[in-house]
């Protein structure tokens, strides 16, 4: 093909053939672009897994069961000295814009517009920071403006899916909506960084009239209200549906799977609770362990059931 393209004018009758070959080659290049799944876990400690992130297993590694993390590590690469901010918003704002917290200056968690979330300190004065989060467009005070890599993927032919926790911008700012960042599909993502409830029986933080009981109510999962479906599982089911739908499109996909787990509250996932109680854990310890294993099960479901890499 390259030889034909080097001499496009040498043989006029071959021009159509050359163009067809070029178009075919472009299609093949598109087909070779990989599908991408980025799996984000919230508030997870480096020892809160059965996969050691040190030279040997720690006592905490022996408590938890995350077989799918182990499987993924064997198939790929581990970064045992990587850094993430200790608070949700800075990490997620860094991820979406490609800038570190020292640059975007979202140094604490965001929620309500023009409202700082710092605790008062008797000694230290907290410097001004971007408490409205990040955005792709100017016009909002105390906001870092940056380009989303998701938008770049979308602009280059990717089908983009957001599932779970967003937490990029404060309420009533452009950045609160995952669509603003280039996601074509948004499942349960909004401004809040936490959740009111993991439980379908509690409508994930909505009352019987369908109204949220707090700003932390998880949106968009009404079909699971009143069921025993843990929110981690509900998000996984919806992500798989979105991926199966994406199979019909002649384009690669990007899925940002951002579980609310393991953020508080420590609601127990009944599927795994008894196992950890038998290990001698307290109620809170066992509930925390179930959040971890539920997250790992979600990872396994995506590894086993997502469309094959392109």
Enumerate the predicted regions with their spans.
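Bacterial Sec-dependent N-terminal signal peptides
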Residues: 1-31
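Active-site-proximal N-terminal segment of extracellular/periplasmic enzymes that hydrolyze or transfer
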Residues: 24-77, 166
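Loop/turn elements at helix/coil->beta-strand transitions in domains of secreted/extracellular proteins
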Residues: 33-36, 75-80, 156-160, 249-255
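Catalytic metal-binding/acid-base residues of hydrolase active sites
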Residues: 44-45, 100-101, 166-167, 260
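Short, solvent-exposed loop/turn and secondary-structure capping segments
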Residues: 47-53, 84, 91-94, 105-108, ...
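Short, structured active-site-proximal loop/turn typified by the sulfatase FGly-forming signature C/S-X-P-X-R
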Residues: 57-92, 98-103, 159-161, 181-190
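Formylglycine-dependent
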Residues: 111-159, 166-253, 259-268, 277, ...
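Conserved small/polar residues in nucleotide/adenosyl-binding loops
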Residues: 304-309
């Amino acid at each position: 093909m390259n030889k034909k393209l080097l001499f496009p004018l040498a043989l006029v009758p071959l021009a159509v053939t050359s163009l067809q070959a070029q178009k075919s080659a472009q299609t093949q290049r598109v087909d070779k672009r990989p599908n991408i799944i980025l799996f984000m876990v919230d508030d997870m400690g480096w020892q809160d897994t059965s996969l050691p992130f040190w030279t040997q297993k720690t006592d905490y590694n022996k408590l938890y069961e995350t077989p799918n993390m182990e499987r993924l590590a064997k198939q790929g690469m581990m970064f045992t000295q990587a850094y993430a901010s200790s608070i949700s918003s800075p990490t997620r704002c860094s991820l979406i814009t490609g800038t570190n917290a020292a640059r975007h200056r979202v140094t604490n968690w965001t929620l309500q517009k023009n409202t700082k979330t710092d605790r008062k300190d008797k000694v230290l004065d907290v410097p001004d920071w971007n408490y409205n989060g990040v955005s792709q467009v100017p016009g909002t005070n105390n906001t870092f403006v940056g380009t989303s890599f998701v938008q770049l993927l979308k602009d280059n032919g990717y089908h983009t899916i957001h599932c779970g926790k967003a937490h990029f911008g404060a309420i009533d700012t452009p950045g609160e909506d995952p669509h603003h960042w280039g996601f074509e599909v948004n499942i349960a993502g909004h401004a809040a960084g936490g959740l009111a409830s993991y439980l379908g029986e509690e409508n994930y933080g909505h009352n019987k009239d369908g109204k949220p009981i707090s700003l932390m109510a998880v949106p968009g999962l009404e079909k699971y209200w009143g069921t025993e479906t843990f929110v981690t599982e509900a998000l996984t089911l919806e992500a798989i549906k979105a991926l199966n739908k994406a199979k019909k499109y002649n384009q690669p996909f990007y899925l940002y799977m951002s579980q609310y787990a393991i953020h508080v509250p420590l609601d127990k996932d009944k599927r795994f609770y008894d196992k950890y109680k038998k290990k001698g854990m307290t109620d809170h310890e066992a509930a925390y362990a179930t959040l971890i294993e539920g997250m790992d099960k979600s990872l396994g479901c995506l590894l086993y059931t997502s469309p094959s890499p392109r």
